[in-house]
């Protein structure tokens, strides 16, 4: 196993255990609003501190991009850890048990290792570039689909980007006619992992941040998924718009986005 993946797993488990334990004293969870429909709790910050100190004790010179703390500069500019200490904060605040710790390591702009840990189910999704994806050490692969007939698609409503709501609803309506069902779970990291593990057949979302998807997208790709932006390119880390499925699934989802999306989201 890649030594950095080892540290990522250690950090994710430590943070995840802290998050799960904090639910036992729910009255001590303090929530503040960062922006429109965007929440942060003291537990997010505590989990992030646990992850950062675990990384720094092994790799003090690496850079870290963290959801709550922003960029933590390091001497080694080539390595970046991208962390989301609690992906699915709204679920966590509501006591809805679906959230995860997400950690990815990028080297010279390419994601090398990734792990996503769900402390409520004790499921650990991992990937290393070129070496496949695993769920609790067992190999996972995406099952190809021919089209959207019978497909279950994961997505999320653009609550933080309501200017795109009309466009999004048109896309959703077009897919609704074709696919079997939608899943809207509240964690982008787990949506991508669930795609990798065949629990859903495809995934699309707009307006994400790099830490929402950095780990999940490598896990999905290493499980055999194609991952693109809304224009069919690979600029999703910049645009924040992502589509993931097997090749024909991506083609079908992109077609609906192109036909129904406004020009502002076709990137």
UniProtKB/Swiss-Prot annotation:
Mg(2+) binds at residues 67, 84, 86. GO terms for biological process: inositol metabolic process; phosphatidylinositol phosphate biosynthetic process; ribosome biogenesis; signal transduction; transcription antitermination. Keywords: Chaperone, Cytoplasm, Hydrolase, Magnesium, Metal-binding, Ribosome biogenesis, RNA-binding, Transcription, Transcription antitermination, Transcription regulation. Its cofactor is Mg(2+). Its EC number is 3.1.3.25. InterPro entries: IMPase (IPR033942), Inositol_monoP_metal-BS (IPR020583), Inositol_monophosphatase-like (IPR000760), Inositol_monophosphatase_CS (IPR020550), Inositol_monophosphatase_SuhB (IPR022337). Coiled coil: none annotated. GO terms for molecular function: inositol monophosphate 1-phosphatase activity; metal ion binding; RNA binding. It is found in: Cytoplasm. Substrate binds at residues 67, 86-89, 183, 212. CDD domains: IMPase. It comes from the Bacteria. One of its GO terms (cellular component) is cytoplasm. It catalyses: a myo-inositol phosphate + H2O = myo-inositol + phosphate. Belongs to the inositol monophosphatase superfamily. Homodimer. The rRNA transcription and antitermination complex (rrnTAC) consists of RNA polymerase (RNAP), NusA, NusB, NusE (rpsJ), NusG, SubB, ribosomal protein S4, DNA and precursor rRNA; S4 is more flexible than other subunits. Part of the processive rRNA transcription and antitermination complex (rrnTAC). The complex forms an RNA-chaperone ring around the RNA exit tunnel of RNA polymerase (RNAP). It supports rapid transcription and antitermination of rRNA operons, cotranscriptional rRNA folding, and annealing of distal rRNA regions to allow correct ribosome biogenesis. This subunit may play a central role in organizing the structure. This is Nus factor SuhB. It comes from Vibrio cholerae serotype O1 (strain ATCC 39315 / El Tor Inaba N16961).
């Amino acid at each position: 196993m890649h030594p950095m993946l080892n540290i990522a797993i250690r950090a994710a488990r430590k943070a995840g255990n802290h998050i799960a334990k904090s639910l036992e004293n729910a009255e001590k969870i303090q929530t503040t609003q960062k922006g429109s429909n965007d929440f942060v709790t003291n537990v997010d910050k505590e989990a992030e501190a646990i992850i950062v100190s675990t990384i720094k004790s092994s790799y003090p010179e690496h850079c870290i991009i963290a959801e709550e703390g922003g960029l933590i500069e390091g001497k080694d500019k080539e390595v970046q850890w991208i962390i989301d200490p609690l992906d699915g904060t709204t679920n966590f605040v509501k006591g809805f048990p679906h959230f995860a710790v997400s950690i990815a390591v990028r080297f010279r702009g390419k994601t090398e290792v990734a792990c996503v840990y769900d402390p409520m189910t004790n499921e650990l999704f991992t990937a290393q570039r070129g070496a496949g994806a695993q769920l609790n050490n067992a190999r996972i692969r995406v099952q190809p689909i021919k089209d959207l007939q019978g497909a279950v698609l994961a997505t999320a409503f653009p609550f933080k980007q309501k200017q795109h709501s009309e466009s999004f609803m048109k896309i959703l309506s077009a897919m609704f006619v074709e696919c079997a069902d939608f899943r809207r779970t509240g964690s982008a990291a787990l949506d991508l992992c669930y795609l990798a593990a065949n629990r859903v057949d495809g995934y699309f979302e707009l307006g994400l941040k790099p830490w929402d998807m950095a780990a999940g997208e490598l896990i999905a790709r290493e499980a055999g998924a194609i991952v693109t932006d809304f224009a069919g390119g690979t600029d999703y880390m910049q645009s924040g718009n992502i589509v993931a499925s097997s090749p024909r699934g991506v083609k079908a989802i992109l077609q609906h986005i192109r036909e129904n999306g406004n020009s502002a989201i076709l990137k």
